[in-house]
């Protein structure tokens, strides 16, 4: 009886299903369509790159940069998607470009003169709207840059040869300080101390503890790389950044003490002209109310870290290449003997060292240290047919660019790549345009002087089984040897014992 009563209900429900199903399915279909649209709405972008995927794409993109390092991640994306790629860092659209025409356009124009990075990270470093390296305030940057341009050209450029020769020879005379029991020379420590000494002699002229300051510079640079693109949440958890904050504070405090000593010497000097240099110009501008104390200290810090930070590694890579290529060493030594003979190096010799200059250029092309440049678009633009919105982050992968276009043997180390003049749009180790490296001319002089001075006294050799290509490196803000895995050491053999003793 009961079963019979239920049968009609069963039949009625069954008959209702076809009518109810379309109504219930419609919202599901709409939701599915919406999600599909969101998932793919960025796929229509004209710029190649990973998909947006409901925000998963930007998250993975940023994580990849944090995990691999800036330089390595740029190489990954350019290799995967081409030479003009759209990715994300901190949720912001970022272009990774290794195309010479695009790079030329960006470096040339003033509306790409700003950089990008974590505001919190740059504040920790003292670089937020201060100094010149990562200052993102165009007005403040333009006010500070002339101090660097003046210091890195003119009289300082002329004095660099004498200062650098003296510094190199003084440190080579004390080579035992950076040589272990096996006779292996820690080349990076040697270069860092030498370059810090030369920079101090030219720009600050205050006695300092080279060993101590060099270690602090290394800690500062490690913190800079670690904090530059960290997400904001990282800075909310104090213990995560405590180590880096300590490293930053140590160098900033040390530079602050040196700057105070410089102020004291300036304001108690009988003859001010005896103290005129980069730091003096900054301090006098501070006294006139044109700069703040923070501006002065940060500019001194950035001037003091520039050479030990990048040029030291650059020269180390060059020495490795010389050791690996005997014919190149022979050509360099022949030119040194032809130009100098037995006399000391002079400023007039710089232009005559053509083989040395080609070697330096090829070394920077083949094994760069600074292989990426970070910029931000300050207005809407179109680059090589691609629309670029105001506020877009840009990373120029110049290290990859130098191995893609123009050079006859891009993947080999050979001086043939610079036998003919190279148009500067294809080779930009120091950049050009409004935000080019202010020290590019003095850097070339320093490298020539250091290499000539060292090679005249020593034959260099890598440790057995070591070569530049198989060396463990980290490629983040800059490309450095991984010092945590192996000592950046070489063997120095005197070329002429009597000549060495003369120094």
Curated annotation (Swiss-Prot):
It is a multi-pass membrane protein. Pathway: Steroid hormone biosynthesis. The chain crosses the membrane at residues 19-39, 51-71. One of its GO terms (cellular component) is endoplasmic reticulum. Keywords: Endoplasmic reticulum, Heme, Iron, Lipid metabolism, Membrane, Metal-binding, Microsome, Monooxygenase, Oxidoreductase, Transmembrane, Transmembrane helix. Expressed in placenta. Highly expressed in follicles (0 hour:hCG), followed by a drop (12-24 hour:hCG) and by an increase (30-39 hour:hCG). Highly expressed in corpora lutea. Also expressed in granulosa cell layer. Not expressed in theca interna. One of its GO terms (molecular function) is estrogen 2-hydroxylase activity. The keyword Iron applies. It comes from Equus caballus. GO terms for biological process: female gonad development; lipid metabolic process; response to estradiol. Heme binds at residue 437. PANTHER family: AROMATASE, CYTOCHROME P450 FAMILY 4. A cytochrome P450 monooxygenase that catalyzes the conversion of C19 androgens, androst-4-ene-3,17-dione (androstenedione) and testosterone to the C18 estrogens, estrone and estradiol, respectively. Catalyzes three successive oxidations of C19 androgens: two conventional oxidations at C19 yielding 19-hydroxy and 19-oxo/19-aldehyde derivatives, followed by a third oxidative aromatization step that involves C1-beta hydrogen abstraction combined with cleavage of the C10-C19 bond to yield a phenolic A ring and formic acid. Its cofactor is heme. It catalyses: testosterone + 3 reduced [NADPH--hemoprotein reductase] + 3 O2 = 17beta-estradiol + formate + 3 oxidized [NADPH--hemoprotein reductase] + 4 H2O + 4 H(+); androst-4-ene-3,17-dione + 3 reduced [NADPH--hemoprotein reductase] + 3 O2 = estrone + formate + 3 oxidized [NADPH--hemoprotein reductase] + 4 H2O + 4 H(+); androst-4-ene-3,17-dione + reduced [NADPH--hemoprotein reductase] + O2 = 19-hydroxyandrost-4-ene-3,17-dione + oxidized [NADPH--hemoprotein reductase] + H2O + H(+); 19-hydroxyandrost-4-ene-3,17-dione + reduced [NADPH--hemoprotein reductase] + O2 = 19-oxo-androst-4-ene-3,17-dione + oxidized [NADPH--hemoprotein reductase] + 2 H2O + H(+). Belongs to the cytochrome P450 family. It is found in: Endoplasmic reticulum membrane; Microsome membrane. Its EC number is 1.14.14.14. Contains a I helix thought to serve as the substrate-binding pocket. Pfam families: p450. Substrate binds at residues 309, 374. This is Aromatase. Residues 294-324 are annotated as: Substrate-binding pocket. Its main location: endoplasmic reticulum.
């Amino acid at each position: 009886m009961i079963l019979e009563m239920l049968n009609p209900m069963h039949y009625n429900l069954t008959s209702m299903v076809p009518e109810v199903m379309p109504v219930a399915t419609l919202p599901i279909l709409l939701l599915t369509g919406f999600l599909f649209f969101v998932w793919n709405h960025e796929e229509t972008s004209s710029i190649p790159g990973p998909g947006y995927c409901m925000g998963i794409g930007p998250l993975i993109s940023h994580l990849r940069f944090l995990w691999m390092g800036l330089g390595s991640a740029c190489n990954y994306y350019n290799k995967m998607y081409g030479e003009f790629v759209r990715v994300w860092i901190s949720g912001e659209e970022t272009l990774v470009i290794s195309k010479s025409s695009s790079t030329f356009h960006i470096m040339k124009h003033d509306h790409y003169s700003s950089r990008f990075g974590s505001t919190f990270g740059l504040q920790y470093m003292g670089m937020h709207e201060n100094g010149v390296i990562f200052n993102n305030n165009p007005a403040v940057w333009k006010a500070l840059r002339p101090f660097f341009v003046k210091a890195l050209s003119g009289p300082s450029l002329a004095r660099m040869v004498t200062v650098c020769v003296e510094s190199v020879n003084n440190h080579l005379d004390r080579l035992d300080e950076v040589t272990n029991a096996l006779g292996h020379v820690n080349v990076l420590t040697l270069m860092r101390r030498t370059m810090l000494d030369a920079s101090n002699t030219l720009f600050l002229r205050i006695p300092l503890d080279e060993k101590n300051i060099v270690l602090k510079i290394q800690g500062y640079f490690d913190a800079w790389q670690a904090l530059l693109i960290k997400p904001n949440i990282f800075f909310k958890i104090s213990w995560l950044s405590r180590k880096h904050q300590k490293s930053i504070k140590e160098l900033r405090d040390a530079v602050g003490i040196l700057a105070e000593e410089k102020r004291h010497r300036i304001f108690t000097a009988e003859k001010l002209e005896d103290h005129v240099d980069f730091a003096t110009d900054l301090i006098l501008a501070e006294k006139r109310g044109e700069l703040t104390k923070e501006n002065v200290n940060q500019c001194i810090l950035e001037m003091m870290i520039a050479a030990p930070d990048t040029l030291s590694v650059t020269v180390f890579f060059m020495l490795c290449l010389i050791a690996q290529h005997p014919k190149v060493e022979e050509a360099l030594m022949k030119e040194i003997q032809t130009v100098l003979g037995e006399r000391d190096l002079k400023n007039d010799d710089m232009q005559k060292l053509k083989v040395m200059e080609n070697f330096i250029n090829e070394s920077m092309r083949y094994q760069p240290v600074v292989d990426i440049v970070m910029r931000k678009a300050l207005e809407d633009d179109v680059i090589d047919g691609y629309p670029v919105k105001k506020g877009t982050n840009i990373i120029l992968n110049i290290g990859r660019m130098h191995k893609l276009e123009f050079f006859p043997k891009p993947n080999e180390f050979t001086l043939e790549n610079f036998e003919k003049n190279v148009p500067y749009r294809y080779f930009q180790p120091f950049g050009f345009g409004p935000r080019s490296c202010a020290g590019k001319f003095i850097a070339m002089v320093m490298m020539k002087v250091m290499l000539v001075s060292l090679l005249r006294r020593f034959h260099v050799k890598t440790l057995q089984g070591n070569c530049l290509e198989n060396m463990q490196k980290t490629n983040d803000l800059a490309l450095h040897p991984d010092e945590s895995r192996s000592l950046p050491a070489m063997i120095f053999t005197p070329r002429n014992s009597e000549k060495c003793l003369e120094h």
